[in-house]
Amino acid sequence: NQDIKVWNISLGSMEEVPRNSISPEAALLDKLQQKYDVLFVVAGTNQENGEPTYLGSPADSINALVVNAVNRNNKPASYTRRGPVLSFHHKPDLAYYGGESNDPIIACCGTGAYPAVGTSFAAPLIARKAAYLIYKMHLSCELAKALLIDAACAWTTPEDMDRLGYGIVPVKIEQILETSNDEIRFMLSGVATERDNYNFNIPIPVSGASYPSVARATLCYFPKCNRNQGVDYTDTELDLHFGRIGNDGRIKSLLPNNQGEEDCTTDEEKARKKLRKWDNVKHIAEPLTSRSKPKKVYANPMWGIM
């Protein structure tokens, strides 16, 4: 049913996924998401008695929103399994409350309230939030995924990404949709075609001769994939540059990035490790600390996204 945009999958294999290849089940989910414009929210799978350690299929789906569990103290649940998948892709994407055996969450079943524990119960709560963003706020699947990741990460540096992904999603939907009084959010969505560049200029408030602000950006997209290519599984790469526009017309990205420029000296290893090349989720941000300083304004006061 193509009218259903969000599908929850609260099941998974007890076996670990291979380190350098995608599972058949995850590859099928990736194909369906890219082809039919749907979003699968997948439980991060559970471990029993400390094993296995790594995620089980289909939680290695690249396009899916993979959810691990935390306890009420915002720490990884005792049964949480870990990423990455395909050697370097960040999975899980997010974490949410899944309870512990001595402190379960309450789920609803056919006979009423039921004390529950597991990533299988955390994932549906995120699926509900994703469905609200898509059906009620009319966001695309990719934009809904990006917004959830951005809300989880916020201005913090992700910790323990192998088990918590980009962070814990806020409980209230208002915390995902709304910004504080000192924040501005821009959301861009569209369809990219092969070998094209897309440039956007964004007006950022200026105070005197500087920008008294910090910034962050989150990019999500659903690429075509090929399971026969091993760790080179994704066929599509979208590069992200976001920052001030210098006097030379180039974007001074928050994360220095000269890919695509004539003087590019970035090798493949660095591009993957530092710039997340071939990863379909990219998050770049400036740290928000007491030492954050205003930034110089160039001749063009706009910021650029490319």
Which ranges hold each PLM region?
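Generic beta-strand/beta-sheet core signal
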Residues: S10, V41-A43, V67, Y97, ...
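Extracellular S/T/G-rich loop segment that most often corresponds to the catalytic His/Ser-adjacent loop
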Residues: T53-A131
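Acidic, glycine-rich active-site loops and adjacent beta-strand->loop/helix elements
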Residues: S13, G44-E48, V70-N71, E100, ...
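Extended low-complexity, serine/threonine- and proline-enriched intrinsically disordered segments
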Residues: V214-W278
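Noncatalytic modules at the cell exterior or secretory-pathway interfaces
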Residues: P212-A215, K273, K282-M306
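Subtilisin-like serine protease catalytic core
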Residues: N1, K35-D37, S61-N63, V85-K91, ...
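C-terminal subdomain of the subtilisin-like protease fold in secreted/lumenal serine endopeptidases
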Residues: Y135-P212
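Substrate-binding/access-modulating region of protease and related hydrolase catalytic domains
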Residues: N1-S57, P115-V117, F121-A122
